[in-house]
């Protein structure tokens, strides 16, 4: 890690995700919080909270009092109204406060975002972040993750998040649009498929997206079952235990046919003489990397392209943020104004 010699600058790396956002600073502070902002439903909530809004895990814990809002809609910023923009503004304000800049200290931040972000999304996020930071740079989250794990060239990074699966061919430079692909099939897509599949098999169960996500987080796997997914649910207010192993498998596998196609498309932008080598250097990051059996399953899906080697990053939930902080520290201070 490069040492921060300028005591008036706090470098911040941010992985801005649909479900969770991760923050790291050049002073060693690190935290993860839910990407949520909650606003009181009525005067009862306002009196109970004593604040106009709550952010992150605190908002989720107090959700019975709140209207919960996500800064991202379908994985993108939602600039439909000024209220929507305020959600993002309040969230960014909170995470910069969490970074704890000292009085008079400048904040230089690199924010990792999905390649799915449009030019309008990037412009809006930069504008809002610049209200709280002196310098801000937006970069592709899978690209940042690849740099963090030492795969800056000759590899493909697959970043499986909550809303998008992002794929990036690492070529030793900032990726161009053709070097990346993004698909809106990831954790939330699996949650919805799992919820519907369980209800189809057990229609009397009381299950929502939160329950489906908890089941997935405990039992997620692809390929051959490694354990029985026997869970306790509620039916007519009573506890019941059901085997949902097959439903978990089917839901977790559901995005990967299209993901494999997108990996193949990204592979095609690599020079043909390098494709076999790159195919042996595929790394998965993000929360989806925790799905059991994933490297072997993705390898089998890529068989038409050749002999693939697929691995999981050492810290899949942190790599994009680590890469963002490292990038922020590597950029000379006098270069920021030129970016």
Curated annotation (Swiss-Prot):
It catalyses: ATP + H2O = ADP + phosphate + H(+). ATP binds at residues 18-19, 74, 162-164, 216-220. Its main location: cytoplasm. Changing residue 141 to E: Increased ATPase activity. Induction: Expressed during exponential phase in static growth conditions in the presence and absence of the mamK gene. Expressed during late exponential phase in the presence and absence of the mamK gene. The keyword Nucleotide-binding applies. Signal peptide: none annotated. It is an enzyme of class 3 (hydrolase). Disulfide bonds: none annotated. This is MamK-like protein. It comes from Paramagnetospirillum magneticum (strain ATCC 700264 / AMB-1) (Magnetospirillum magneticum).
């Amino acid at each position: 890690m490069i040492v921060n010699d300028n005591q008036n600058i706090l470098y911040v790396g941010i992985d801005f995700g649909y479900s969770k956002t991760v923050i790291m600073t050049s002073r060693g502070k690190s935290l993860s919080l839910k990407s949520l902002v909650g606003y009181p439903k009525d005067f009862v909530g306002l009196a109970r909270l004593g604040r106009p809004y709550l952010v992150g895990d605190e908002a989720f814990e107090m959700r019975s009092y709140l209207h919960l809002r996500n800064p991202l809609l379908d994985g993108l910023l939602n600039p439909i109204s000024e209220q929507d923009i305020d959600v993002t503004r309040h969230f960014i304000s909170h995470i910069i406060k969490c970074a704890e800049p000292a009085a008079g200290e400048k904040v230089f931040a690199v924010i990792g975002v999905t390649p799915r972000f449009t030019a309008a999304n990037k412009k809006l996020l930069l504008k809002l972040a610049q209200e709280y930071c002196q310098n801000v740079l937006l970069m592709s989250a899978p690209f940042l993750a690849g740099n963090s794990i030492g795969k800056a060239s000759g590899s493909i990074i697959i970043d499986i998040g909550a809303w998008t699966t992002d794929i990036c061919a690492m070529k030793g430079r900032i990726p161009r649009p053709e070097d990346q692909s993004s698909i809106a099939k990831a954790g939330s897509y699996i949650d919805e498929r799992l919820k519907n599949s369980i209800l189809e098999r057990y229609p009397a169960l009381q299950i929502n997206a939160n329950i489906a996500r908890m089941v997935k987080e405990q039992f997620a796997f692809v390929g051959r079952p490694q354990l029985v997914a026997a869970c306790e649910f509620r039916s007519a207010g009573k506890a019941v235990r059901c085997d949902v192993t097959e439903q978990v498998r089917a839901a977790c596998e559901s995005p990967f046919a299209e993901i494999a196609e997108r990996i193949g498309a990204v592979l095609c932008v690599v020079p043909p003489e390098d494709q076999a080598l790159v195919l042996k250097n595929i790394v998965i990051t993000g929360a989806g990397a925790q799905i059991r059996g994933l490297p072997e399953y993705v390898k089998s899906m890529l068989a038409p392209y050749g002999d693939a080697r697929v691995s999981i990053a050492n810290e899949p939930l942190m790599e994009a943020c680590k890469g963002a902080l490292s990038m922020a520290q590597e950029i000379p201070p006098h270069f920021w104004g030129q970016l």
